[in-house]
């Protein structure tokens, strides 16, 4: 696997091309209360367990300041990342959870440049 592919989030595992995703979430009031009641709870371990159960590999898991509370990086397939989102949302632990796939921006903008050549503006 090339260095550029790895930098763009393309990972090869057991002969399959895997993607890299960032999940950015806001925890629920229920989880916030549970965390306050048991501040030593190992959220990393429980997050890793459910992530792996969805078929993903947990790369990182961080609590952050700001509009959102947690950011994690996972490797796998898109459907697996969506399954993880559904699982967390249905558990009531997360109020909001976004899934962002790492893309090859050079390829995206090359495709956009090619598509732009076919745009015909009205009156031209």
PLM region descriptions:
Residues 1-17:
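Short, Lys/Arg-enriched N-terminal segments with co-localized hydrophobic residues
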């Amino acid at each position: 696997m090339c260095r550029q592919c790895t930098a763009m989030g393309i990972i090869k595992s057991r002969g399959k091309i895997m993607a890299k995703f960032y999940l950015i979430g806001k925890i629920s009031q229920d989880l916030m209360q549970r965390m306050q009641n048991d501040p030593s709870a190992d959220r990393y371990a429980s997050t890793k367990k459910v992530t792996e159960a969805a078929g993903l590999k947990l790369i990182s898991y961080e609590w952050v300041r700001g509009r959102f509370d947690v950011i994690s990086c996972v490797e796998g397939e898109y459907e697996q990342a969506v399954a993880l989102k559904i699982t967390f949302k249905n558990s009531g632990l997360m109020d909001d959870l976004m899934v962002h796939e790492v893309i090859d921006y050079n390829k995206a903008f090359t495709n956009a440049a090619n598509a732009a050549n076919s745009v015909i503006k009205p009156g031209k």
